[in-house]
C-alpha cells in the first residue's frame, strides 16, 4: 500500500512542476517582442485653440522630428525608429498622427494607429507578442502617457518628476529600455528634454 502511494505521488509531481512553471513561460513569451527593444514616447506636438490639427509651432515640431529621430543620438548610439505608432484619430484630434507624418515620409514607413488613447494595455500586449523592431516611436495624448508607461512596467511620475504630464509641456521624450528578457530596465530609462524649438527646455 505504501509503495502504491509513493508511486502515485511521483506520478503527480511532474504535473505540479509543469503547472508552477507555466506562468513564467507564458510571461517570457508575452515579452518576446520587447527583448532588447528601445521604446520612445512623445506627446503630440502643439495644438491650436480649435480644430483637430497642429498649431504652426506644432507643425514646426513635427518637421523637426523628421531630423531629430533620423537618427536620434542618445548615449553614444544612433537610434532610428523602425515602427511609428500613434493614437487612432478621433473627432477631436488627429495630432499624434500629424506629429509623426513628416518623419514617416522621411523614413518611408507607415504610421500604425490600431488603438485609442485608453487602450494602452492592448498596445503593450501587442508589442510584446508581435514586435520585431528594435526601436519603436509612439506619439500619444499627454493625459494617457503615464498609463502607457505603467503598462510597459514603468513609473511615469518617477520618470517625469511630475504627478502628471503638464498641460503646457510638448518637448519631453520618454526613453524606455528593455533587457534580453523583454523586461523594462528602469535604471536605463529616462526623460530627455528636447531642444528643437525656441523656448524648449525653459
Where are these regions (language model features)?
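Bacterial N-terminal signal peptides that target proteins for export
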Residues: 1-10
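Sec/Tat signal peptide C-region and signal peptidase I cleavage site
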Residues: 20-24
Amino acid at each position: 500500500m505504501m509503495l502504491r502511494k509513493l508511486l502515485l505521488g511521483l506520478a503527480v509531481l511532474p504535473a505540479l512542476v509543469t503547472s508552477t512553471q507555466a506562468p513564467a513561460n507564458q510571461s517570457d513569451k508575452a515579452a518576446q517582442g520587447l527583448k532588447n527593444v528601445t521604446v520612445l514616447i512623445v506627446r503630440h506636438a502643439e495644438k491650436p485653440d480649435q480644430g483637430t490639427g497642429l498649431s504652426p509651432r506644432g507643425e514646426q515640431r513635427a518637421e523637426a522630428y523628421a531630423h531629430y529621430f533620423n537618427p536620434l543620438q542618445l548615449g553614444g548610439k544612433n537610434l532610428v525608429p523602425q515602427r511609428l505608432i500613434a493614437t487612432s484619430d478621433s473627432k477631436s484630434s488627429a495630432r499624434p498622427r500629424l506629429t509623426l507624418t513628416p518623419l514617416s515620409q522621411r523614413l518611408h514607413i507607415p504610421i500604425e494607429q490600431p488603438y485609442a488613447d485608453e487602450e494602452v494595455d492592448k498596445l503593450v500586449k501587442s508589442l510584446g507578442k508581435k514586435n520585431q523592431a528594435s526601436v519603436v516611436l509612439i506619439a500619444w495624448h499627454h493625459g494617457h502617457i503615464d498609463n502607457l508607461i505603467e503598462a510597459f512596467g514603468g513609473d511615469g511620475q518617477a520618470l517625469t518628476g511630475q504627478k502628471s504630464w503638464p498641460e503646457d509641456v510638448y518637448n519631453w521624450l520618454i526613453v524606455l529600455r528593455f533587457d534580453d528578457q523583454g523586461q523594462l530596465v528602469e535604471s536605463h530609462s529616462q526623460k530627455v528634454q528636447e531642444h528643437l524649438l525656441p523656448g524648449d527646455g525653459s
